[in-house]
Structures are given as structure tokens and as C-alpha cells.
């Protein structure tokens, strides 16, 4: 029996390390794509992201820059002994991975 993409990704996550982190980002992308596509069961690899990134590389650069600023802000907050109120470092790192992946897949 052939394993599904999600099952393969979950297996990679369970193994940990760098491949597990990338797989975790892809799983997050799959779940979020359900929210961004009106709950339709669309293959996340087939989603047209041009409306989200209308200015090509500039749009991707802006989003990656924004996420990097958030990451740096959260690190500073952590160094000051404070916790994030919402999405933390791991969530922001996963977003950065996915936005970089969107750029590479364009």
C-alpha cells in the first residue's frame, strides 16, 4: 500500500532533524492552504499564489523581511526574559521556510 504525502511527512517529522523541520513546515502549509482556499481540498502545490505575491520577487522579499523582523523581535523579547503573546520563534521559523519555498516553487 502506498503511503500518502501526509503520512510520509509525518514520518519525517517523527525522525526529527533538519528533514523533520522541513516536513513540519510542509504539513503546516497543507493545513493553512485549506483556510486560504475556502476549505476546498486543493493540492497545495497547485495553488496560484500570484495574488498573494503580485510584485514577484519584491513581494516575496517583503514577506521574508517582515518575518525576519518578527523573528529578531521575538529573540530580543526572549533575551529580555519575556514570552511571545502569540506565534513564537518556531512558528515564525516555519513561516520563513514556507515563504522561501513558495518563492522557489513559483
Q: Can you name each region flagged by the protein language model?
A:
Residues 1-106:
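Intrinsically disordered, low-complexity regulatory regions
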